[in-house]
Amino acid sequence: MTRATVTKGSGNVFRDLGFSEEKSAELILKSSLLQALQETIKDRGWKQVEAAARLSIDQAKVSKLLAGQMAGFSIERLVNFLSLLGQDVEVTVRKAPRGRQIGTVRARTTRKLAKIAG
């Protein structure tokens, strides 16, 4: 029987996949924004056509967003989409702890915000 080798991850799936620190930070943020967008659309029970109308994009783009395809959508555009759907998006910048030269990127979503009817 063959034994599987398990390597502990770093906690950052994109770094573990070989992306650079900069690209990894971008992908973490984009994926969190995308998840919040997906949850908002799902929680409101909208069909893709209705979400497309509210976001002023075509249904095919909504389909890509709901399928998790981030390519072609900038962080700025995802933030704008969330705003159009009545979501507040906050960005906090603070100095990295002493001894760490490179800062980290974290994103949190508050599910309660996504559940506001609209």
How should these model regions be labeled?
Residues 1-35, 99-117:
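N-terminal flexible/basic segments that precede or flank functional cores
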Residues 66, 93:
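DNA major-groove recognition helix of helix-turn-helix
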Residues 69-74:
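Short, solvent-exposed alpha-helical "recognition" segments
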Residues 15, 42, 53, 83:
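Short polybasic/polar patches that bind polyanions
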Residues 75-92:
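DNA major-groove recognition helix of helix-turn-helix/homeodomain DNA-binding modules
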Residues 45-63:
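Short alpha-helical DNA-recognition segment
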Residues 54-56, 97-101:
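Glycine/charge-rich, flexible interdomain linkers and switch-proximal surface loops
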Residues 33-50:
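Short basic helix-loop element that most often maps to the first helix and adjoining turn
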